[in-house]
Amino acid sequence: MIEETQTPSPPAPAPAPAEYPIDLLTVESLDIEAQGIAHRADGKVVFIEGALPFEQVTANVYRKKSSFEKATLTAIYRESSQRVTPACPHFGMHTGACGGCKMQHLHIGAQVAVKQRVLEDNLRFIGKVKADNLLRPIEGPAWHYRYRARLSVRYVRKKGTALVGFHERKSAYVADMTECHVVPQHVSDMLVPLRGLISSMDARETIPQIELACGDDLTAMVLRHMEPLSVADLARLRAFAAANAGLQWWVQSGGLDTVKLLDAQVAELSYGLPEFGITMPFKPTDFTQVNPHINQVLVSRALRLLGVQPTERVIDWFCGLGNFTLPLATRAREVLGIEGSEVLVARSRENYERNKASSHVRPALEATKFVARNLFEMTPAMLVKDGAAEKWLVDPPREGAFELFKSLAALHQQVVTGVPCDDGIHQQSLALGGWTPPSRIVYVSCNPATLARDAGVLVEGGGYRCTAAGVVNMFPHTAHVESMAVFERL
């Protein structure tokens, strides 16, 4: 999502923290931030940036707390078999290194194993849940997968040039990048020309960011500018687009409501879900998955795990643009998509109408509806009002779906124990009518901690068991953990 931001001037460099060396340590594991975890002889934990499991290393401590220390790697005396040479010259643990990736020095298979362990640990320690089965990890291309990104921009007067890219590690400064191995190759090839473009503009000192959004055939770049663009600057943007086929410039002078195409065009951003005959138009301000290759597999697996039958009604909670809703509609009798944003609901309805017009999917999409509702203020009464559905697909933001599952658990307790539900105002026994809880829930998560918390609600008090869980490597080389879990009603 594009936000209204103004990049501040980088702060004055802080005094270098006092460092002191520590003796040889054996790294035991990695934390979620890809820091090696070791223990001193007295049991104190040391987090070591750049170190990998089973390596013997020395390090310099730069932060000392009563229960742990943080350190930077200085030497490796026994190297891990999983250590690899980073593909990108801008990756590293040194000052000035790009902070966009954290794990390029670790083999991709080992990265996935780390994320799987993070998911299992979160389920065990936060949710007190153990999945009956582990799903095979969903994996895709390791490089040039990132179709959405926010590129920071800063013009450096002393150097007479603009920097365009991600921030440096643990810094507000923009990394001095000339290439990037996670964005599409054609975008990486544009980084140096983009630096030249920004440097040539009259507004070069008041452009804080460029938002990148790639579709299957087009690339959109949203230029955030803090002062009006001159006629000459507009001409420079148009010339740059003309020299880079498939590039659309969008401009943003203020909040989200100011984002607009520089020049009206017939072509629009879209991505496809070919297995379901679905094409999803979107705007650069819409939320879409960063990795389109993984998204196709994710949607396919979610529907397969849900096991939707032609006679069933399905609810897609946090439906967004309809990424899951429209494919579900090709399998189910009826689908209800629910989203908290009126804007996204309007966009999902547009996508529904566009795809309904396609003859090969039209019959299955006739019974699809979308509604807007604040899903972070759900109550049992609201849940009953939405009607019964045999299956649920839940794909929340990082905050998770706690209120939704708390309401579901409250209804379960009313049925099982007769304890009245809290409808958000007072306790009352709700008239359930024909309402019944879903027999199966597939939960897609971008935050393993909130997934684990919500899983605990379902398993402890909602009448479900977790039959399967696994990771989705949506963001290779980063510490981000995407995952999914399946819940069956007991």
Curated annotation (Swiss-Prot):
At the top level, the lineage of the source is: Bacteria
**Which of UniProt's keywords are assigned here?**
4Fe-4S, Iron, Iron-sulfur, Metal-binding, Methyltransferase, rRNA processing, S-adenosyl-L-methionine, Transferase
Instruction: Give EC number(s), comma-separated.
Output: 2.1.1.190
Report residues binding [4Fe-4S] cluster.
Answer: C88, C98, C101, C180
| Database matches in InterPro entries | 23S_rRNA_MeTrfase_RlmD, MeTrfase_TrmA_CS, NA-bd_OB-fold, SAM-dependent_MTases_sf, U5_MeTrfase_fam
**Where S-adenosyl-L-methionine is bound, by residue?**
Q289, F318, N323, E339, N374, D395
- What residues does the TRAM domain cover? 14-75
Keyword Membrane tagged: no
The enzyme's first-digit EC class, named in words, is: transferase
Give the catalytic activity: uridine(1939) in 23S rRNA + S-adenosyl-L-methionine = 5-methyluridine(1939) in 23S rRNA + S-adenosyl-L-homocysteine + H(+)
Keyword Disulfide bond in the entry? The reply is no
BP terms from Gene Ontology: rRNA base methylation
> Any idea which residues are catalytic in this one?
C446
Q: Which Pfam families match?
A: tRNA_U5-meth_tr
Spell out the molecular function terms from Gene Ontology: 4 iron, 4 sulfur cluster binding; iron ion binding; RNA binding; rRNA (uridine-C5-)-methyltransferase activity
PANTHER family cross-referenced by the UniProt entry: 23S RRNA (URACIL(1939)-C(5))-METHYLTRANSFERASE RLMD, RNA M5U METHYLTRANSFERASE
Function, as annotated, reads: Catalyzes the formation of 5-methyl-uridine at position 1939 (m5U1939) in 23S rRNA.
Q: Which NCBIfam families match?
A: PRK13168.1, rumA
Q: Which family does it belong to?
A: Belongs to the class I-like SAM-binding methyltransferase superfamily. RNA M5U methyltransferase family. RlmD subfamily.
Which protein is depicted?
A: 23S rRNA (uracil(1939)-C(5))-methyltransferase RlmD
